[in-house]
Amino acid sequence: MKISLKTDIGQKRSNNQDFINKFDNKKGITLVILADGMGGHRAGNIASEMTVTDLGREWVKTDFTELSQIRDWLFETIQSENQRIYDLGQSEDFKGMGTTVEAVALVESSAIYAHIGDSRIGLVHDGHYTLLTSDHSLVNELVKAGQITEEEAASHPQRNIITQSIGQASPVEPDLGVRVLEPGDYLVINSDGLTNMISNDEIVTILGSKVSLDEKNQEMIDLANLRGGLDNITIALVHNESEDVE
């Protein structure tokens, strides 16, 4: 598995409230964590960096290799982090702080993931993009209820309101899933600063180009910025290389 991580402030924001990193546990299992923070002042930066760093610090202590162990760990650790961020958010300096989180553990050819908020995890297989997560957002609830279309959701005035985040008062309910990555498959883990700017078809086209994984990642960021870069842009690309690739 090859991994590329990149983050960019974009064209319109004065600071970067996204944070991304990867960590290996004692058995060499990699956990990629992406968070998109929210909250005034520097609260969003702190919420995202703290969530990624806290989860990573706990992950490196583990020696899990079984998917069931990792699944339970993700659920419990994200619950604990929600409480920690909520408690910090009660102080005046950090009022309203919160963050999305995508946490993806790579076990041989499988990816097991946890999802909170409106960042996304997608799979590109045989030239097709499949969204593995469902946005925890007001507009997605309206789409699922049949009240608005996906096209209307893209320009809806309340499209930035999310229905679950790390730092909320009530316990979070992370969506958990597992996916086998076949040779040649890509995972695309990203903040909404990417998917609000470029289409899934454009993601597929860029991934099909004959350049390095880091260059593909940078091409996506450059295109999102070319379109206006209205938000911070953060991407993790995971490539299960074909067996014939050295």
UniProtKB/Swiss-Prot annotation:
Binding site for Mn(2+) 2: 36, 192, 231
Catalytic activity: O-phospho-L-seryl-[protein] + H2O = L-seryl-[protein] + phosphate; O-phospho-L-threonyl-[protein] + H2O = L-threonyl-[protein] + phosphate
Cofactor dependency: Mg(2+); Mn(2+)
Superkingdom of origin organism: Bacteria
EC number per UniProt: 3.1.3.16
InterPro entries: PP2C, PPM-type-like_dom_sf, PPM-type_phosphatase-like_dom
GO MF annotation, one: metal ion binding
Keywords assigned by UniProt, alphabetized: Hydrolase, Magnesium, Manganese, Metal-binding, Protein phosphatase
Cofactor note: Binds 2 magnesium or manganese ions per subunit.
Ranges of residues in domain PPM-type phosphatase: 2-240
Positions of Mn(2+) 1 binding: 36-37
Alphabetized Pfam families for the sequence: PP2C_2 (PF13672)
Protein name, entry field: Putative protein phosphatase 2C-type
Organism: Streptococcus pyogenes serotype M6 (strain ATCC BAA-946 / MGAS10394)
Lineage per the UniProt record: Bacteria, Bacillati, Bacillota, Bacilli, Lactobacillales
